């Protein structure tokens, strides 16, 4: 388009605007202003969110790979002056990372698997079967989402003490196997919403083929609910991985990563200085604590990077966004 054509087009637009009502002209001006301002506003919001999310991670990485003397150097901000892996190695040795990681995975993966099975069966029952007290029981499920775990922790402790399972993995496995583990309420709700969205004709066809309720659940429902199973599995893994409150109540010697990081200062003092009561500068502790946090979150970050797509699809199909 040459200059003359552009000039003619602008003149036509001016003539057209002169013929427009004042209300329409005012609307066009507001729309033009909005179209100009909104991209800038959106960019600022996204930049702020990125800063809030990425700043702790970048700070963690920066501190984990520097010497503790760099923490007292005001000229060192982001890039370490003395790049080293000593903090990572010392923290891993102090945490007994190998045994702690194995213990954490044993509780995490096992409880997550048990909780998936138990909450899936419960959610399927609420979605497809009619029985007395169904609404009341589902209200209890909603209360499990709203009521904090601290409310039932003391009765649970008395029960487990009577059973003789305190300081064993059974204190985590038993609630998971009975659909009462960490955040079990939201998992039941996810499965219920997903199973309610599946067509009833699937079960009718299975019934005509001679399948009972349990076989229908195994053969028809589970294959169609794999996205929800993956979503609940990721939720369960993250919540069990980060839990220290429940573990701290029931464990005195079984160590998990979350428990170790919660008590990281005496652990570091005992391992590095042979004195659990030693006082070290809080700023110097940062390199070890950030190294411990980095080692703890790395598996979760890697899992999310590789499974993000499936996780998002599962959330959308479960109905939590609708």
Where are these regions (language model features)?
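Short, Lys/Arg-rich, polar N-terminal cytosolic tail immediately upstream
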Residues: 1-33
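A structural signal for multi-pass alpha-helical bundles of membrane permease subunits
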Residues: 31, 38-322
């Amino acid at each position: 388009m040459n200059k003359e054509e552009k000039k003619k087009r602008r003149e036509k637009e001016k003539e057209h605007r002169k013929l427009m009502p004042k209300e329409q002209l005012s609307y066009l001006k507001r729309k033009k202003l909005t179209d100009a301002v909104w991209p800038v506003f959106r960019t600022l919001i996204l930049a702020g969110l990125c800063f809030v999310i990425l700043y702790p991670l970048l700070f963690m990485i920066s501190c984990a790979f520097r010497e503790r003397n760099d923490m007292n150097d005001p000229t060192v901000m982001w890039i370490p002056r003395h790049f080293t892996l000593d903090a990572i190695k010392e923290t891993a040795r102090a945490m007994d990372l190998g045994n702690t990681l194995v213990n954490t995975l044993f509780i995490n993966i096992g409880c997550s698997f048990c909780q998936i099975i138990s909450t899936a069966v419960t959610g399927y029952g609420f979605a497809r079967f009619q029985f007395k007290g169904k609404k009341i029981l589902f209200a209890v499920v909603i209360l499990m989402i709203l009521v904090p775990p601290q409310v039932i922790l003391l009765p649970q402790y008395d029960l487990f003490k009577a059973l003789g399972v305190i300081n064993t993995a059974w204190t985590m496995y038993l609630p998971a196997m009975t659909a009462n583990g960490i955040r079990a309420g939201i998992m039941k709700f996810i499965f219920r919403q997903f199973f309610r969205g599946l067509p009833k004709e699937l079960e009718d066809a299975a019934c005509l083929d001679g399948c009972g309720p349990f076989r229908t659940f195994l053969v028809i429902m589970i294959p169609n609910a794999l996205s929800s199973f993956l979503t609940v599995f990721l939720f369960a893994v993250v919540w069990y991985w980060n839990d220290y409150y429940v573990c701290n109540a029931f464990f005195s010697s079984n160590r998990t990563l979350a428990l170790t990081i919660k008590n990281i200062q005496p652990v570091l003092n005992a391992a590095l200085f042979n004195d659990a009561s030693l006082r070290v500068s809080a700023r110097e502790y940062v390199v070890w604590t950030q190294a411990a946090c980095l080692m703890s979150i790395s598996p979760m970050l890697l899992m999310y990077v590789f499974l993000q797509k499936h996780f998002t699809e599962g959330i959308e199909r479960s109905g939590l966004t609708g």
